[in-house]
Amino acid sequence: MRRKSRSVRLWAVVFWLIVWQLAAMALRAAYPHGALLLASPNAVLRRLFALAGTAAFWRAALHSTAHILGGFLIACAIAVALAALSARYRRAEELLAPLIAVIKSVPVASFIILALVWLSSRTLAIFISALIVFPPVYANVLEGVRRTDASLLEMARVFRVPLRRQITGIYLPQTLPYFRSAVRTALGLCWKAGTAAEVIGLSGGSIGERLYTAKVYFQTDDLFAWTAVIVLLSALFEKLFLLAINRFAERMDCDATDCK
């Protein structure tokens, strides 16, 4: 069954761009240096194209993407494994509960500053991204495993279906919707947390470093341009990951029904 589209509507984007443009014009009219307070969409777009024409732009984008998505993938792997363990053993869930509560309640900035004591700025974004992604993925996958159809599991036990077949034929199809929901939430969180780690840790050659430099030199158009890059990369990889999950789910459905 297809889900109702929740994509951003073009008219809504245009509306907020107009609001942004009007606000920038009002500030320029009210203050001599109003452009320093809020760059216009046109200025940001021009600056974005200028940055995209440099090799340093692509190196920074690749650097941040590799570190932030690396942390995301590491967290997903660990969260799925520990969720499966917690679903099987109650003590494992009880053991992890305080850790999950701490991660969810402590501010990201506190984790970043503490992590800088132990880690270099180059690996900081990986660690922080993984740390922030872990709780939602763990919680969703654990919920998905626990909501697996008990009648199917009973049938698998009666017919002595191997564990591998139970995982691919029962657990995965019923857990994927929960994992998909977690990915939608976690990808946005990891980009925000990872970029914050780069800004505070001044990770060399990263988007976060460019944001910090733009702030120090009052380059408002650069600040907005790099922010737009983060938004675009986050949206792009969310679409790619969700597409991959959907394709995987369709392939499993085909395997289950022997479709060609």
Outline where the language-model segments fall.
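N-terminal signal-anchor transmembrane alpha helix
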Residues: 3-31
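Periplasmic/extracellular loop-to-transmembrane helix junction in inner-membrane transport proteins
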Residues: 27-73
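Transmembrane-helix boundary motif in ABC transporter permease subunits
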Residues: 70-100, 113
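C-terminal transmembrane helix and the adjacent membrane-cytosol boundary/short C-terminal tail
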Residues: 90, 177, 181, 224-260
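Generic hydrophobic transmembrane alpha-helix motif, especially the helices
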Residues: 101-136, 143-144
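Glycine-rich helix-loop "coupling/hinge" segments at transmembrane-helix boundaries
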Residues: 117, 145, 192-230, 253-259
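Transmembrane alpha-helices
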Residues: 127, 131, 164-197, 225, ...
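Short cytoplasmic-facing helical segments at TM-TM junctions of multi-pass membrane proteins
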Residues: 140-179, 211
